[in-house]
Amino acid sequence: MKLKNKAILFSTVILMNLPLVTLSCKKITNNDFEELKKNNPNFNFIKEGIDYILKSVDSSLKEKEEINLPNFITKISDKVFKDFKKLRKINLENIKEIGKEAFSNTNLEELKLDSLNKLDPSTFLGCKSITKINAPKLETIESKTFQNYENLKEISLENVKEIKDYAFYACKLLKKINIDNVKKIGAYAFKYCYSLKNLNIDKVQKIEEYCFSSCTSLEKISLSNLKEIPNEAFSGCTSLNNIDLKNIEKIGSYSFMNNKSLASLDLSNLKEIGTSAFSNCYGLETVQNLNKLKEISEGCFYECTSLKNINLKNIEVFQLNAFSSCSSLETIDFAKAKSIGNNAFSKCKALTSIDFKNVEKIGNGAFLGCSNLKNIDFNNVKEIGQAAFYECKALTSVDFKKIEKVANRAFIGCESLTTINFNNVKEIDELAFSRCESLTLLDLKNVKKIGKKAFWNCTALSSIDIRNTEEIYDEAFSGCSSLVQFDLKNVKKIFKNIFLECEALKTILINGNKNGQNNNYKVIDGKQVYDKSNNSLIVDLS
């Protein structure tokens, strides 16, 4: 008990000897405010709550290259420093709000916006001298905020969640950027940022069209959370060589057009791809894992001249120009394909053989100019479009299993073609086999109609069977300079000049007879053919 009393007494003595301290929040008086104004005569400011708002400055400051704001200023009103063309440096670290056009048309070089959480697009309008921006609290970059800032080189925006349309459009020197937490990037946001090299946007969930278009120095980009790439998002990124698209489900039109440095792609989850998505990607060699894609769009891989390997076994439809001018493509698996669009594989000069398996329709010019294509199995093909195999110069044989009509110019210029099995073909259209210079024999016994110039300039052709042919159109066999004898059999209609420039042709027969006739025509001495309906001379070899 005595010990306790001593402790209390000792504490009391200590307290009595300490100075008295009063805790209080000093309220700024009018006198204090006037004192601030007096000490800062070049700055006109007001007080609202806890904030000091700069309303204007003395005109003499317009001649200054550097201005030091009083450290108590927290907000700057509209147009305060507008057209201060000599201004290069100002301390803005404590500023949490800046008005419209506050620094427009100044020559500021660096922005440290440590306290700013919102920025109007006009605040720094026309400040083309800015080279560096640090704004750690900003969450949104509004549309066109830094558009055409041609000297901007470095940006740190670690807290930004959204970058809107045209935000950094044509910032041609922008090289370093920290936007690690951004989730959405607007249209054209970084288009023409020629110096941008590497970019991590792993948290981005959505990007808009053209957002990185023509970023010609961009080499690497990480976008693991993205599911969809819109139209022209990376078009013209000619240095891009490292991009992971494994999680991408949809790629828009022209998204990677003219990306010359892309070498390989893994498209494991891709379900939809737009027009010309990878056209003119000259360095692209390999495309893997197209397991979920059913259709290759128009011009999708047009002029990917290095493309050698691509698994197409799950593709059902190939659209117009899908692989046109892929001059290194050697093999194609058409396991599930039903149709092949116009010019889909035209000028694929390395292709040597094709098994069409389930293909039923081949479009116009589909394999035009495939100059090394030697073997074709038409299997279930029912329709071949115009010029489908135009100038396939190495093609040696063709077997038409289910085809009933050979279209206009379908095999024109197939100069190595020696064997054709026409099977059920009923009609051969205009110029279909013209300039097939190695053809020697034709069995056309099931063909009803032979079109204009169908076999024009087939210079080796010497034997033709047309026993059931009903119509032969203009110049059908013109220029067949090896043709010696021709039997019209039971033909019903002959058009003019069917044997024009057939210099070796000496004899025309009807059913084996030099003086034979059928229901429509008669031949005299194997030299002259007359139309029996009007006794007009149709062919004259004399």
Where on the chain are the PLM-derived regions?
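The feature captures the LRR N-terminal capping module
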Residues: 29-53
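Generic detector of contiguous secondary-structure segments
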Residues: 33-36, 108, 494-501
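Eukaryote-biased recognition of intrinsically disordered, low-complexity regulatory segments
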Residues: 52-61
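Beta-rich interaction/scaffold domains
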Residues: 1-31
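Consensus positions within tandem repeat domains that build extended binding/scaffold surfaces
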Residues: 78-80, 99-102, 120-123, 142-145, ...
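Structural signature of tandem-repeat unit edges
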Residues: 43-47, 61-75, 85-97, 106-118, ...
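Hydrophobic alpha-helical membrane segments of integral membrane proteins
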Residues: 36, 530-531
